[in-house]
Amino acid sequence: MSVKIRMKRMGSKKRPFYRIVVADSRSPRDGRFIQQVGYYNPLTEPVDLKLEEEVIMDWLQKGAQPSDTVRNLLSKQGIMQKYHEARFAKK
């Protein structure tokens, strides 16, 4: 089972917001997920982004792979940098 951290589309037509979820890679985009770890609303000014950093770090250490878009959001928040530092500090 490959686990991904990805965005689940919510909201109405032409007014999307996204929940950032941990899901099995085989489940549909808006389908079943394991855990919600944040949300992202691109329509507000400034952009509304909330991430549960400790939970995301835990999933990354367990081997979950972020999607490209989620990886960019995590990088902007500095979470990917902390993950890489923690990962290479152990070796």
From Swiss-Prot:
Keyword match DNA repair: no
Question: What single Pfam family name could you report for this chain, choosing any that match?
Answer: Ribosomal_S16
* Top-level taxonomic group: Bacteria
- Covalent S-S links between cysteines: none
Molecular function GO terms recorded: structural constituent of ribosome
- A GO CC term assigned to this protein in UniProt: cytoplasm
UniProt GO BP: translation
Entry-linked InterPro entries: Ribosomal_bS16, Ribosomal_bS16_dom_sf
Q: Which UniProt keywords are present, listed alphabetically?
A: Ribonucleoprotein, Ribosomal protein
HAMAP family in UniProt: Ribosomal_bS16
Family per record: Belongs to the bacterial ribosomal protein bS16 family.
Q: Which NCBIfam families match?
A: S16
The protein's matches in PANTHER family, at most eight in alphabetical order, are given as: 30S RIBOSOMAL PROTEIN S16 (PTHR12919), SMALL RIBOSOMAL SUBUNIT PROTEIN BS16M (PTHR12919:SF20)
Protein name, entry field: Small ribosomal subunit protein bS16
Source species, please? Latilactobacillus sakei subsp. sakei (strain 23K) (Lactobacillus sakei subsp. sakei)
